[in-house]
Design a protein with these regions (language model features):
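Catalytic core of DAGKc-family lipid kinases
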Residues: 3-132
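Short beta-strand-to-turn element immediately C-terminal to the catalytic PLP-Schiff-base lysine
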Residues: 51-53, 88, 136-137, 162-164, ...
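Short acidic/glycine-rich loop or secondary-structure boundary segments that cap or lie
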Residues: 82-85, 127-129, 142-145, 169-173
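Short Gly/aromatic-enriched secondary-structure transition segments
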Residues: 89, 149-152
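Short, conserved beta-strand edge motifs with alternating hydrophobic and charged residues
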Residues: 118, 129-130, 135-137, 160-164
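ATP/nucleoside-binding phosphotransfer catalytic cores, i.e., glycine-rich phosphate-binding loops
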Residues: 121-128, 153-156, 163-235
Length: 235
């Protein structure tokens, strides 16, 4: 609701707020310090992303208007393995062990079947293949401190997208090693960036925004709204 208003968002420790604060160099472990920043810090304008699930013809261009199938995100959105991992992490376990809960839930889906993907960036078809997950990020550092999208910047007017397509446990390990070592793309990890990203998948895949699991979808549109949100950060 603060997008486009100029009213600043204050970040308090917990959930997606932690991820956003971490990407902004903020406080993630002290409620008192975070509250002080929220009241006395300076404003920084950041981009926001919009996810449109199964867009209508009108929703295929321009910034989307408020609608039941339109969702805002500040950190990331994803589908496939990414969303299944979020969906299967029990709330009680997340409260106790944090991001490690996603590791446990992710293990259940390592052998899920891949899905067919067509990826278009700024009107340009860039990828058509079988894949396991798609992550679209407004910033680079994700859960557990992993930098999946090293070129992402929260105020560059672009979204970054990663497709992860391992065909075996060995390739899963290879993807993890590549991400942790901040290495270039490989056969099971491909990254792009743009302002307007469309994804078509078959069969339909579960999707999420900022860790909130939504519905299954076949066609998804991700679009950036540059510098649309003011966030209170350290002076």
């Amino acid at each position: 609701e603060l997008v486009g208003t100029g009213v600043a968002l204050g970040l308090l420790p917990g959930g997606t707020g932690n991820l956003l604060a971490r990407n902004l160099g903020g406080v993630v472990d002290s409620l008192e310090e975070a509250a002080t920043i929220a009241f006395t810090g300076q404003d920084r304008r950041i981009d926001v992303g919009w996810l449109v699930i199964d867009p209508t013809q009108e929703q295929r261009s321009g910034l989307p208007r408020a609608a039941p199938n339109v969702h805002c995100f500040t950190v990331m959105a994803g589908l496939g393995f990414d969303a299944q991992m979020m969906a299967d992490a029990p709330e009680g376990v997340k409260d106790k062990v944090g991001w490690a809960a996603y590791v446990a839930s992710g293990g259940k889906h390592l052998n899920d079947a891949p899905f067919s993907l067509e990826l278009t960036v700024d009107g340009r078809p860039v990828l058509r293949r079988k894949t396991r997950t798609v992550v679209v990020g407004n910033c680079g550092e994700l859960t557990g401190g992993m930098v999946l999208l090293p070129d992402a910047s929260i105020d560059d007017g672009r979204l970054d997208v990663a497709t992860v397509s391992p065909e075996s446990l060995t390739q899963w390990i290879g993807v993890a090693a590549r991400v942790l070592a901040n290495r270039d793309d490989g056969p099971a990890l491909e990254r792009e960036s743009g302002r307007d990203i469309t994804v078509s998948v078959h069969p339909p895949q579960l999707c999420e925004v900022d860790g909130d699991v939504l519905a299954e979808a076949t066609n998804l549109r991700f679009v950036v709204q540059p510098r649309a949100l003011a966030v209170r950060v350290v002076r």
